[in-house]
């Protein structure tokens, strides 16, 4: 399997091909290549020692919020992929789910118009609403910090 868009098997159908090959007892190997989420993680300025890659979230808000809620209390830096058509909705749902955490949006990494925006989710959402998103996006969101708690969490336990 050869790809022109990063490491095969990361958020693409390559995963299915690899699993089927393994099930059929076919030897599988790979030559490591670039993976956009690793580059976005490093460039985000957020902690890199422990992270969770979540890939593409569900397309609709209700499913996306449930998907994000699974990691609401996670201390790990969270990484998502998103399309330009759903970026604004994603950021609205992320702000609602995670609160106004530090985050970064990476776009068109390794290309001529590569960009990384950093700031609170609210500021990133405001910036996205002022421009027309293009290309694929990687969103990196800080995990829950020390002293933070989930809404309704009992701090006396």
Label the model's feature ranges.
Residues 13-18, 68, 118-123:
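Charged helix-capping and loop-helix junction motifs
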Residues 8, 35-38, 111-112:
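Short gly/pro/ser/thr-enriched loop/turn and capping motifs at secondary-structure boundaries
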Residues 1-6, 10, 78-82:
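Acidic beta-strand-to-loop metal/phosphate-binding motif
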Residues 3, 30-33, 80, 105:
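General beta-strand structural signal in soluble alpha/beta enzymes
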Residues 76-157:
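A contiguous loop/helix-start segment that scaffolds small-molecule binding in enzyme catalytic cores
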Residues 4, 33, 56, 108, ...:
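Cofactor-binding loop segments of dinucleotide-utilizing enzymes, especially the Rossmann-like FAD-
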Residues 16-74:
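Class I SAM-dependent methyltransferase SAM-binding "motif I" and its flanking Rossmann-like core
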Residues 7-10, 59-60, 113:
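Short, small-residue-enriched loops and turns at beta-alpha junctions
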